[in-house]
């Protein structure tokens, strides 16, 4: 509804709970809010005394749409949904991220494997986490191997060993692959690891102490010494950890502000043990308070499907949380589980709150420093290439294939803060002559810039091509055909002997090559962007090639027709999951014998990687 007459408009608003959307002259949603009383909340925007941020927003508001909800909880959940849908510029916006990684223990296997895992939790077994990032998973994986010596190798590697691998030599595995440990003893290792994951370190220490005493009495001193070392390592770990006093799962949210920017850090406490932390830097309008940022951040983060259903029993914030009970009830309702939120600084959480706030401040400081550094590098590119306007966004394309097979084009995007990975794109190339890099590049650029021209994304200031003047000419022709203007076209070509540092740069419309010194910061960033496009293209190409070869091999297996192939892919949810499956898991598919399962397994691993 337009607001030509605010007084009359406000009288039409309901007094119940709901959500309001503020729209500009083009009908674009620029702010979304929730309210217990819509009339009272929206009226507050028409007072004379408003802060500068709200004044700037209201100067653009042309209409306000309201949605009535049945209760307050529904209003909060709908607000989070609308923010995700419309991405309003005056809301705190949490960037999309990858799903969280786990440690996966294949407990259904005779000798369970412990491994890194990311994705939907379909495979049988135990999942521990989520961890904030891949680094935390690998750090904990190394710790578990050191303490409990569980195998990490793939099924194919495990079943084809005739002697122990290096992991056994460095005392990170007990070598069940060659029978150096029996199933019962290995199961004890697995049980100890599970207790450790669950935070029951005391129980593990009691068990290990009993085994140490028994082996010592039986004069098996080497084994007794092994248990002694395990006990020492566990006790050392206990001293390093701040234990909350409970065994539940807790997220501690720290928040910090610097020069108008706001950053968060979440400490992940699982079973009384901190398994890592992760920083977040949402887009926050200038003038946003810490309390407002916290109120908008929490629902967006915990209602995201990327959480994969992993919600802690308690959330603790380092700053007071407005509408704490409202948010607590709404999240409990929306997530269909009981959730507690604590914002008071008292035992047993006080130390965690201080640590979370410190991590948030430190991460924000580093983020701003990196942002400033990147802005300087973009400015250096503008000066070094003598470009007319400042650069805020660069796209780079590269092509990858193996003798024309499984050609893939990559597009990576860099902005003022570094790589923008959510905007990366890969293009599976088809319908061009194998090995025709020009044709592949034309197809990728056409597909990309048709969408950008139609408004699906943002046009870059600079388009960088991995190649020479020939590739640059293809890019110029595509953009001219699509009538896309305002994009500076550049290319980076390999130098003599393909040596790094000797690359040549081209700018469309200029005849001469550009050679920058090897220590030039603009040159370093151009190389970094080119290398990232190359990495992304190669990864996508290898995956496509492996998938195509496996599909081709599956078609050649006797007994695997189109229907059975479809049944296999449907059962596992895709080719990637089928490749991860063991022979035993494949044999569980209705109509697949153990002999056929082995043939399928061998086919899946013949071309893997």
Curated annotation (Swiss-Prot):
Location within or outside the cell? Cytoplasm
Q: Which organism is it from?
A: Coxiella burnetii (strain RSA 493 / Nine Mile phase I)
Share what the entry says about its subunit structure, partners included: Interacts with UvrB in an incision complex.
What is the similarity comment for this entry?
Answer: Belongs to the UvrC family.
GO cellular component terms listed in the entry, alphabetical order: cytoplasm; excinuclease repair complex
Q: What does this protein do?
A: The UvrABC repair system catalyzes the recognition and processing of DNA lesions. UvrC both incises the 5' and 3' sides of the lesion. The N-terminal half is responsible for the 3' incision and the C-terminal half is responsible for the 5' incision.
Q: One Pfam family of this protein, by short name?
A: GIY-YIG
Span of domain GIY-YIG: 15-92
Record-level Gene Ontology MF annotations: DNA binding; excinuclease ABC activity
Q: What keywords are assigned to this protein? A: Cytoplasm, DNA damage, DNA excision, DNA repair, Excision nuclease, SOS response
- Supply the SUPFAM superfamilies for this chain: C-terminal UvrC-binding domain of UvrB, GIY-YIG endonuclease, RuvA domain 2-like
Residues in UVR domain copies: 202-237
GO biological process terms held by the UniProt record: DNA damage response; nucleotide-excision repair; SOS response
- Please state the protein's primary subcellular location: cytoplasm
Gene encoding it? uvrC
This chain belongs to which protein, by name?
A: UvrABC system protein C
Where on the tree of life does the source sit, at the highest rank? Bacteria
